[in-house]
Amino acid sequence: MGEIKTITAEQLQAKVEAEEVLNIIDVREDFEVANGMIPNAVHIPMNTIPEKLDVFDAKQTYYIVCAGGVRSENVCHYLTANGIQAVNMEGGMYSWNGEVK
């Protein structure tokens, strides 16, 4: 697998706090997102990504988030292989110190 783009939790938090328009996809399971998600993130569980490919726009960039950064990295590889621009948030929600909703 090729290299994928990454962003740190701190870098993504700065973008969120600057109110940038972002496409953040949280790929954790339902019970995990019940504890909170990054504001404006969209929840698409990892196992449903293949059937939801049509919701992704190849002209947009998507920031992919999970609990620790491993599942989101796998999703980034999958999306990239399907022509979608995906960026993995390193460390996942364990590294997120910003607001959650």
Regions found by a protein language model. Give the residues of each.
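Short, surface-exposed ligand- or partner-binding patches at beta-edge/loop junctions that are enriched
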Residues: 65
